[in-house]
């Protein structure tokens, strides 16, 4: 399943450093507790990550792909044990 993930600057999420075009694995996936979270709809990610942080710096966003069967309890936020981080998305203007 393909989707989108938000990050703090530097592709950091919950103190974990991510990298483009890299696969990450965790031993367990449980919504809001364990695993790596993402949204299928890119606009849903904005419910969890603002475009601009309170300090004026932008958050980062990337395309992702779950390489296992993702879990969800609301069909909006998904959780995976094995997630491929694709390319970062940018806003050009």
PLM features: what roles do these ranges have?
Residues 1-93:
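Short, glycine-biased loop/turn motifs at secondary-structure junctions and
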């Amino acid at each position: 399943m393909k989707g989108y993930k938000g990050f703090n600057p530097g592709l950091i999420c919950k103190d974990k450093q991510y990298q483009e075009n890299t696969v990450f694995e965790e031993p367990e996936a449980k919504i809001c507790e364990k695993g790596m979270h993402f949204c299928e709809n890119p606009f849903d990610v904005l419910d969890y990550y603002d475009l601009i942080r309170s300090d004026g710096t932008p958050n980062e966003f990337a395309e992702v792909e779950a390489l296992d069967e993702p879990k969800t309890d609301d069909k909006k936020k998904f959780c995976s044990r094995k997630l491929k981080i694709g390319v970062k998305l940018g806003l050009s203007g």
